[in-house]
Amino acid sequence: MTPTLETKYVFTITARIGDVTSAGEIGTGVRRIIPILGGEVKGEGISGKVLPFGADFQIIRPNELIELEAKYAFETDDGAVVYVENAGIRFGPVELLQKLKCGEPVDPKLIYFRTRPRFETGHPNYQWLMQHLFIGSAARHADRVVIDVHQVL
């Protein structure tokens, strides 16, 4: 019997983002830094706000594959602060990736954008975030990134 992998949707992170800062070509690609300005977290049993600090650190490889590593935090409505490290990749047809870079709309279904969020918190209500693996299915918009977070069962 082939093993299966099941997931369940748990919440959505909508992170508002600022203007891109480029550190230029670093030998392995172009380094970009995108500030996280705030946002919201919404799901069953968890809701709150993305705190206005942190950033998404990216390298755009020569083949246009984008490697991402975002570090930020959110605060739940009941006062828990949750630190987030979210690594992932974004890839698709070059012409669509170029549109995204220019802030133009692109159908998210046409871009492969997946992440592996990790969470840390000392709040007892949210220890489960540190006791499971999660996968994010994400979409990039001109002013925000939307990540649907799924728990691996």
UniProtKB/Swiss-Prot annotation:
Q: Name the domain of life.
A: Bacteria
- InterPro entries, sorted: UPF0311
The record's annotation in Pfam families points to: DUF3237 (PF11578)
UniProt xrefs under Gene3D superfamilies: 2.40.160.20
The signal peptide annotation in the UniProt record is none
Q: Belongs to which family? A: Belongs to the UPF0311 family.
| Protein name (database record) | UPF0311 protein Rpal_1987
